[in-house]
C-alpha cells in the first residue's frame, strides 16, 4: 500500500493549511490519484488495523438503499452515529441516491441495477456511472456525499472502477473508502462474469486534519505488510444477495489500530 503512504507524505510535505467546516483545520492538497491492481491482493491498509465488519456492513447498507442507522446498529456498526437524527435518519444520502434517485415525473432510478445490467449488455459503454451527488437533495442530507461518483470500465474481460471523491479525510476515511470500493468492484465483477482489473481512486480536496498529524507520522513509521486476499462466495450471482458471511478475508496481519477522533 505504498500508494497510500505516498499520499500521506505528500500532504505532510506540500499540504496547504486550510480552515474547514468542522473548525478543526487541515493540511490539504487538491487533485491526486492512486491505482490498485485488484488481482495483486485486496487493498486493505496494513500499517494500522481496519474494521472489516464496518466496511462490509456499510457497503451492504448502501446497496440496500437504506438511510437509517438501525441496520448498522443491529450489526454493531456505529460509524454514522454522529450525523444521524434522533430517529436514526440521515436524509437522502448514498443508499437513497444509488437505489432510488428521484425523477421529475415522480419516479425513481435504481442506478445500481441499471449499471450492472448495462455492464452485462454493453460492457464497452462509457456511461457505466453511478452518482450520489444530487444538487436538489444536498441540503436535505445529514452529510453530503464525499465519495460522490464512480464509473466502471471493461477491457479484455476485466472490470475496473474509478471513484471520484470530492472531499477525503485521508487518515480515517480514505483507507475505509479504498477497501469499500475495491470490494464493490469485486462484487460487480462476480455477478457480471468478469475478472478483476483496477481500482482507481481520484481525489478533489484530500486532507489531513490537524489533530491527526501525529497519528499519520506514526503510521508512516511502520513498514507495510503483504496484502491480504478477499474471497467472495462464488454462488452469489445477484449484487443485492450478498451477506456478510459471503466475504472471507485471509492473510490480514496489520499493525495495531491507531486511535483518532473523527471531525464532525
Swiss-Prot record:
One of its GO terms (biological process) is methylation. The keyword Methyltransferase applies. Pathway: Pyrimidine metabolism; dTTP biosynthesis. It is found in: Cytoplasm. (6R)-5,10-methylene-5,6,7,8-tetrahydrofolate binds at residues 169, 263. It comes from the Bacteria. It catalyses: dUMP + (6R)-5,10-methylene-5,6,7,8-tetrahydrofolate = 7,8-dihydrofolate + dTMP. It is an enzyme of class 2 (transferase). One of its GO terms (molecular function) is thymidylate synthase activity. GO terms for cellular component: cytosol. The active site is at residue 146. DUMP binds at residues 21, 126-127, 166-169, 177, 207-209. Its EC number is 2.1.1.45. Belongs to the thymidylate synthase family. Bacterial-type ThyA subfamily. Homodimer. Catalyzes the reductive methylation of 2'-deoxyuridine-5'-monophosphate (dUMP) to 2'-deoxythymidine-5'-monophosphate (dTMP) while utilizing 5,10-methylenetetrahydrofolate (mTHF) as the methyl donor and reductant in the reaction, yielding dihydrofolate (DHF) as a by-product. This enzymatic reaction provides an intracellular de novo source of dTMP, an essential precursor for DNA biosynthesis. This is Thymidylate synthase. The lineage of its organism: Bacteria, Pseudomonadati, Pseudomonadota, Alphaproteobacteria, Hyphomicrobiales. The gene is thyA.
Amino acid at each position: 500500500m505504498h500508494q497510500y503512504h505516498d499520499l500521506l507524505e505528500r500532504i505532510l510535505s506540500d499540504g496547504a493549511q486550510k480552515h474547514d467546516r468542522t473548525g478543526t483545520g487541515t493540511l490539504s492538497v487538491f487533485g491526486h490519484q492512486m491505482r490498485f491492481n485488484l488481482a495483486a491482493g485486496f487493498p486493505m491498509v496494513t500499517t494500522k488495523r481496519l474494521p472489516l465488519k464496518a466496511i462490509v456492513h456499510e457497503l451492504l447498507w448502501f446497496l440496500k438503499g437504506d438511510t437509517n442507522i438501525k441496520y448498522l446498529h443491529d450489526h454493531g456498526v456505529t460509524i454514522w452515529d454522529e450525523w444521524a437524527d434522533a430517529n436514526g435518519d440521515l436524509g437522502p444520502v448514498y443508499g437513497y441516491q444509488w437505489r432510488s434517485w428521484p425523477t421529475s415525473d415522480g419516479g425513481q432510478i435504481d442506478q445500481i441495477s441499471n449499471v450492472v445490467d448495462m455492464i452485462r449488455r454493453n460492457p464497452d459503454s462509457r456511461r457505466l456511472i453511478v452518482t450520489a451527488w444530487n444538487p436538489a437533495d444536498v441540503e436535505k442530507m445529514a452529510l453530503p456525499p464525499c465519495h460522490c461518483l464512480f464509473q466502471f470500465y471493461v477491457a479484455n474481460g476485466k472490470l475496473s472502477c474509478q471513484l471520484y471523491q470530492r472531499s477525503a479525510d485521508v487518515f480515517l476515511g480514505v483507507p475505509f473508502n479504498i477497501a469499500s470500493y475495491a470490494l464493490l468492484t469485486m462484487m460487480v465483477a462476480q455477478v457480471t462474469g468478469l475478472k478483476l482489473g483496477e481500482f482507481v481512486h481520484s481525489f478533489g480536496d484530500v486532507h489531513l486534519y490537524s489533530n491527526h498529524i501525529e497519528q499519520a507520522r506514526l503510521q508512516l513509521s511502520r513498514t507495510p505488510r503483504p496484502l491480504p486476499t478477499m474471497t467472495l462466495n462464488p454462488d452469489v450471482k445477484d449484487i443485492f444477495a450478498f451477506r456478510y458471511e459471503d466475504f472471507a478475508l485471509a492473510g490480514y496481519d496489520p499493525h495495531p489500530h491507531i486511535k483518532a477522533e473523527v471531525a464532525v
